């Protein structure tokens, strides 16, 4: 009987532990969802930096302006607040594809891709068995925001969609994203699919380092040639208002970007622009509509170009508010991967980290015996005198040898003569 009681207690204990574990997991999964759903107004945190230019009041729930060179946020309104990204997710899909594939590869569509085709989501009407180049797939991914293409790219690159999603999350962590979790390659709604304006700017910044990525993300038009199952060409034109030349929201210097929308995410927008050698990235999330997102992004770009400049520092440059010089910055030296890195701060705000170039030893100048230390031309007579002195100095040892030999010979002669004289005297007096 005691054995049965002991067994019952054991089973009950295991049951309690199991239920507790389930509750913990559920709570963990619900944390991100709660963070997204419980939206509260957020402030512009960069406005709290002493001496920092006041940033614009954008109407998007969150937004950032990033210096693409340093990765520094020049403006942040809820930059680390979790939101649903929608189709700006495809920026990461594009990045992984160009990093892992040739644009000439053929992509064969399966049920994986075609299942995501619906009348109310972006697509180009691909069919099972249809073949398209990776190049065409990527332009369709960005310009048309085709969800079935995103899913098929994921399967093609990762082997399975899930493995590709794992690649997305691993790459995000490598880039430095701290509040991002992907569950699909398209950005279709899912409670566990989320990111932040800051993290999306980091992903865009990483992508801009890749020439293929940069070319595709900045395309306004592309024509997909007829395929094995479609005799018609598919003509694509950008939906990004700041990139489209005909748009009233077109921004001069726009490099490219990606739009996004779902009812849960609202309108999301990622944009890069370059002027006067400076590239900025803006991200706005949960805007009321695309016009608002574009207006907010334009305000952020204008804020950046009007209020900041580049300051030259040892080994590179950092963005600083107008009127601020290197003398106003604080430098903190540290080591990263065996290299010396200088962190530059303005009123305790990190502006950027610059790797310090290794100092190259300066060779000492060769001493020229004929040169004039006064900087003028050496007189030829002085050169001749110097040469004469060198010849005299060189001849002294030879003369000394000769004199020593003569002196020794004379001494020996004196000794011989002295001995001979002594013998004669002995005979004389003897």
Specify the residue positions occupied by each region the protein language model found.
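Catalytic-site microenvironment of enzymes
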Residues: 4, 74, 395-399
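C-terminal segment of classical bacterial N-terminal signal peptides
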Residues: 18-29
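Active-site-adjacent loops and short helices of periplasmic peptidoglycan-processing enzymes
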Residues: 27-198, 202-211
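Hydrophobic alpha-helical membrane-embedded or membrane-associated segments
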Residues: 10, 14-18, 409-412
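Bacterial N-terminal signal peptides that target proteins for export
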Residues: 2-12
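Domain-terminus/edge residues, biased toward the C-terminal soluble/receptor-binding domains
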Residues: 177-178, 189-430
